From Swiss-Prot:
Subcellular location: Nucleus, Nucleolus
Subunit structure: Component of the 66S pre-ribosomal particle.
A GO BP entry: mRNA transport
GO CC term, one of those recorded: preribosome, large subunit precursor
Protein name: 60S ribosomal subunit assembly/export protein LOC1
Primary location recorded for the protein, binned into one broad class: nucleus
Superkingdom to which the source organism belongs: Eukaryota
Function: Required for efficient assembly and nuclear export of the 60S ribosomal subunit.
Biased composition (Basic and acidic residues): 142-167
Alphabetical keyword list: Coiled coil, mRNA transport, Nucleus, Ribosome biogenesis, Transport
UniProt lineage: Eukaryota, Fungi, Dikarya, Ascomycota, Saccharomycotina
């Protein structure tokens, strides 16, 4: 059993402890960020620097097997559909740039309209009202022609579809008639082949 300590010894032991008086500024992170000299603020890097031997090994592996693609993607970048989410049938989410429309190379109407409307803000600097009205009229005319062409294309597409359906229906109708005629011919042949039986009467 250890000998009992006196009160004086205990007091001396506690009084002789060294105490650090640290300012509250350093303890509070928000206040510490405002200091001019920020002591020990940068966190240590978790990535260890490779030794020369490890670097050599790594380079040899790359030469042998090729470098790995170290790019990592987050979930939101991969456009994975969310689980437990109702998917509306028939609605397909658009991808790519919005409002991007491609013009055919031989589409002179659209190209002319675009050229005239793009030059609009540069030409209006020094042009008279008459010139401006003439140019705007040209743009309107080109737009009208474009609309007419679109309507005509729609109409042609619809007519083509109608003709296709009509031709399909006529082919099906002809096939049905042919089958019906063949069936009738078979029935007639079967009727000719069967000889009618003679009636017999027996007396008891």
């Amino acid at each position: 059993m250890a000998p009992r300590q006196s009160q004086t010894a205990k007091r001396n032991k506690t009084q002789n402890k060294t105490r650090e008086n640290e300012s509250e500024v350093f303890l509070d992170s928000a206040a510490r960020n405002l200091l001019e000299n920020q002591p020990k603020l940068a966190a240590k890097s978790k990535v260890k620097k490779l030794s020369k031997l490890q670097v050599k090994k790594q380079q040899a592996k790359i030469r042998l097997y090729g470098a790995k693609n170290g790019k990592e993607y987050r979930e939101e970048q991969l456009s994975i559909p969310d689980l437990n989410k109702a998917i509306v049938p028939g609605v397909k989410a658009k991808r790519g740039k919005k409002g991007k429309k491609f013009v055919d190379d031989n589409d002179s109407l659209t190209l002319n309209r675009l050229v005239k409307s793009i030059n609009d803000k540069y030409d209006q600097v020094n042009e008279s009202k008459l010139e401006k009205s003439r140019r705007l009229e040209e743009i309107r005319e080109l737009k009208r022609q474009e609309m007419e062409r679109k309507e005509q294309m729609k109409k042609d597409k619809l007519d083509g579809k109608k003709d296709e359906l009509r031709s399909k229906a006529s082919v099906a109708r002809a096939a049905r008639r042919k089958n019906a005629k063949a069936r009738k011919a078979d029935e007639v042949d079967e009727g000719e082949n069967t000889v009618p039986k003679k009636k017999k009467v027996s007396f008891a």
